[in-house]
Swiss-Prot record:
GO terms for cellular component: endoplasmic reticulum membrane. Belongs to the phosphatidyl serine synthase family. Its EC number is 2.7.8.29. Residues 57-68, 124-186, 238-286, 343-355, 405-465 are lumenal. Residues 449-465 have a biased composition (Basic residues). Catalyzes a base-exchange reaction in which the polar head group of phosphatidylethanolamine (PE) or phosphatidylcholine (PC) is replaced by L-serine. Catalyzes mainly the conversion of phosphatidylcholine but also converts, in vitro and to a lesser extent, phosphatidylethanolamine. Keywords: Endoplasmic reticulum, Lipid biosynthesis, Lipid metabolism, Membrane, Phospholipid biosynthesis, Phospholipid metabolism, Transferase, Transmembrane, Transmembrane helix. This is Phosphatidylserine synthase 1. It catalyses: a 1,2-diacyl-sn-glycero-3-phosphoethanolamine + L-serine = a 1,2-diacyl-sn-glycero-3-phospho-L-serine + ethanolamine; a 1,2-diacyl-sn-glycero-3-phosphocholine + L-serine = a 1,2-diacyl-sn-glycero-3-phospho-L-serine + choline. It is an enzyme of class 2 (transferase). It comes from Xenopus tropicalis. Residues 440-465 are annotated as: Disordered. GO terms for molecular function: L-serine-phosphatidylcholine phosphatidyltransferase activity; L-serine-phosphatidylethanolamine phosphatidyltransferase activity. One of its GO terms (biological process) is phosphatidylserine biosynthetic process.
Length: 465
């Protein structure tokens, strides 16, 4: 009996582990400004969804088979998202509302299940699904069939250079700005950028559109588009790191302008921490973890090009850019959870969103290999091994350079994320809000304090009045 009671008693390490994992898998809202948006409304939601389903089920026309299937699929997605809000974890983020990130996780689970479903179809059935979604895809052609790449690279003119600044160059720039906001490291961003250009060289024999002139690859892609996006993203990161996060409640704001500003700022991060992927005290496991991060990142990028090449749709088609947008959204909590798993010694397993993202990346690759056997039969295994080896070497050099920079180029002022090589601490909240300690107000100083209250520092654009 005593042994059974002991087995049910959690040790201090188990309690700390559960708390650390909950911080990255189900972050709680600590500063609730409007109680209505954070109170459970399960009975109301159940009543609304049930009545709505009954109404549409008995009142809509059901003569069209295609319309019935489409409306049924949308209803399944809608109710799955409702269940996601009720049952799934928040993830590491709480802004603008935890329910949004629960639905994001729900959409990632749906996409994961859809990829599993695709594995049990044949090529004709997959194309039938695509043609049902968009009949115009029957007449789609591959970009590599109508365009030439890496032709007359010795001809360098201003007109030719300016012709490359199209919508895709704009997408490269803003895409790398968002990647920098997610990764928050110059070293890793530049490493991924250079590694991707090498990835294009190693897989150029499979995808002809990877062939580029040297000046297009080095100057336009790496230096201008990627480099400019990285610089912009990191400047925003540094700005967010230096801000003071002291959120005012709606109840304490008495002006209309202040309430509007506070409502808009609800869509900004609740806090921002300085990220350090590697330091001199890191172990070999950290190096292997960063290498795995690089491989999955490159694999996700490769899936984008292989999917549109194998299933034949243009880069401008909604199937392409909607997937890119969706992957970008679920990457945010994934990187946050993976960084915590990699750097926090008390976090012993990855978060659920990170797990699903990894499964999606490998499932997409599996789908590409199954339905693109004719394409992958031309693969040179030597190039694949050289690619893996090159990524390993570049990753090691990147991490070594980051350690050298930390040792010889000056240490940054220690922040919460650097202390004890841990992202989290049991004694300090995750968001690390520094609130000034207010001295007790004397009786004869009350009037002067109230007069000078409006002259204090305004944080996050909202002042208390």
């Amino acid at each position: 009996m005593v042994s059974a009671m002991r087995s049910r008693t959690l040790s201090k390490d188990d309690v700390n582990y559960k708390m650390h994992f909950r911080m990255i898998n189900e972050q709680q809202v600590e500063d609730i400004t409007i109680d209505f948006f954070y109170k459970p409304h399960t009975i109301t939601l159940l009543t609304f969804t049930t009545v709505s389903l009954m109404y549409f089920a008995f009142t809509r026309e059901n003569t069209s088979q295609e319309d019935n299937i489409w409306k049924g699929i949308l209803s399944v997605i809608f109710f799955f998202l409702i269940i996601s809000v009720l049952a799934f974890p928040n993830g590491p983020f709480t802004r603008p509302h935890p329910a949004i990130w629960r639905m994001v996780f729900g959409l990632s689970v749906l996409y994961f299940l859809f990829l599993v479903f695709l594995l049990f179809l044949n090529v004709e059935q997959v194309k039938a699904v695509m043609y049902w979604l968009d009949p115009n895809l029957r007449y789609a052609t591959r970009e590599s069939d109508v365009m030439e790449y890496a032709v007359n690279c010795h001809v360098i003119t201003w007109e030719r250079i300016l012709s490359h600044f199209d919508i895709f160059a704009f997408g490269h720039f803003w895409g790398w700005a968002m990647k920098a906001l997610l990764i928050r490291s110059y070293g890793l961003c530049w490493t991924i950028s250079i590694t991707w250009e090498m990835t294009e060289l190693f897989f150029m024999h499979l995808l002809p559109n990877f062939a580029e002139c040297w000046w297009d690859q080095v100057i336009l892609d790496i230096l201008l588009c990627n480099g400019g996006g990285i610089l912009l993203g990191m400047v925003v990161c540094r700005f967010l790191e230096m801000r003071t996060y002291h959120w005012a409640s709606f109840k304490d704001i008495h002006t209309t302008t202040g309430k509007i500003k506070r409502a808009v700022l609800q869509f900004t991060p609740a806090s921002w921490i300085y990220v350090r992927w590697f330091d001199p005290k890191s172990s070999f496991q950290r190096v292997a973890g960063v290498y795995l991060f690089m491989i999955i990142w490159q694999l996700t990028e490769l899936n984008t090009f292989f999917l549109k090449h194998i299933f034949v749709f243009q880069a401008s088609h909604p199937l392409s850019w909607c997937r890119i947008l969706f992957i970008g959204i679920i990457t945010a909590p994934t990187v946050r959870q993976y960084y915590a798993y990699l750097t926090d010694t008390q976090c012993k397993r990855v978060g659920t969103q990170c797990w699903v993202f990894g499964a999606i990346a490998f499932l997409e690759a599996t789908v590409c290999i199954k339905f693109g056997q004719d394409l992958f039969s031309k693969t040179h295994l030597l190039y694949v091994f050289l690619w893996l080896f090159s990524v390993a070497v570049i990753t090691f050099l990147c991490l070594y350079g980051m350690v050298w920079y930390a040792d010889y180029c000056g240490q940054r002022e220690k922040t919460f994320s650097e202390c004890e090589d841990s992202t989290y601490n049991t004694d300090i909240p995750w968001h690390h809000i520094d609130k000034p300690v207010e001295a007790p107000v004397k009786q004869n100083e009350g009037t002067s304090r109230r007069k000078n209250r409006h002259k204090g520092k305004v944080t996050n654009g909202v002042g208390k009045k």
